[in-house]
């Protein structure tokens, strides 16, 4: 089933008070330095039906959209050629990054760069029960301080999650996620792939992808320098960490319980 951000967010903010809170949160995350402009944008957007408002937030609010507003500061009077008051949301081109569905729960990711931290998923999780039914777990909270992005998260089976330690996903973020998911789900281990921190290898899914239950594509440049770690939950409720010395193909075959895998 394909679902659409605009539709599901609009459902989540159907209540007028939730709509106000959502809009205030989005404006607070949009780096608006002028109270006068902020108030004008709030009034402009709040007057729209929910679906239209969400679509406009995603597309960005241009200066030409706000015809008049009351100047309340020097910054209100200073003009430049930049076309937007509120920038478009680049995350919506890469929808696997802001969140991930993992077992019976969801990650709402704290993105690595500020431009990508204006999110819609938090409201969908909190207020849209078609999207996140009662009992859905939250493994990773968007408000956490450590970055994880969804391109680094790969569910291998009901017991194993792979995650990239990369340019955009931190070790601290992985620890926070692993602590939650291993305590409260069927997952028994998190396999950490440390990949080179450069833009060409930005996420795990740019260099390693599962295409069948026992088949994977892998970028040849990461096979040599690849470091692997396994994170499990101890009987005392504390995380255990170990370096993996097995070859990747052997490790994958073992955790997937298959005779062999094709890379």
Where do the protein language model's features map onto the residues?
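The feature marks the mature, well-folded catalytic cores of soluble enzymes
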Residues: 1-263
């Amino acid at each position: 089933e394909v679902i659409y951000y605009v539709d599901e967010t609009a459902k989540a903010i159907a209540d007028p008070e939730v709509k106000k809170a959502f809009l205030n949160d989005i404006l607070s995350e949009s780096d608006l330095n002028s109270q006068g402009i902020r108030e004008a944008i709030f009034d402009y957007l709040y007057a729209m039906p929910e679906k239209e408002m969400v679509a406009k937030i995603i597309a960005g609010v241009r200066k030409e959209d706000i015809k008049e507003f009351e100047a309340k500061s020097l910054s209100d009077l200073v003009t430049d050629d930049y076309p937007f008051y509120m920038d478009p949301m680049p995350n919506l081109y890469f929808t696997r990054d802001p969140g991930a569905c993992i077992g019976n729960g969801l990650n709402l990711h704290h993105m690595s760069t500020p431009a990508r931290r204006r999110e819609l998923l938090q409201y969908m999780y909190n207020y849209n029960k078609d999207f996140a039914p009662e009992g859905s777990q939250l493994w990773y909270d968007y408000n956490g301080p450590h970055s994880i992005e969804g391109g680094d998260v790969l569910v291998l089976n009901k017991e194993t999650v792979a995650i990239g330690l990369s340019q955009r996903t931190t070790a601290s973020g992985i620890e926070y996620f692993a602590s939650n998911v291993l305590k409260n789900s069927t997952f028994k281990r998190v396999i950490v792939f440390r990949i080179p921190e450069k833009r060409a290898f930005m996420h795990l899914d740019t260099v390693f992808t599962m295409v069948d239950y026992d088949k994977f594509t892998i970028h040849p440049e990461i096979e040599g320098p690849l470091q692997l770690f396994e994170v499990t939950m101890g009987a005392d409720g504390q995380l255990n960490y170990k370096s993996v010395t097995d070859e990747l193909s052997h490790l994958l075959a073992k955790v997937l319980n298959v005779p062999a895998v094709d890379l």
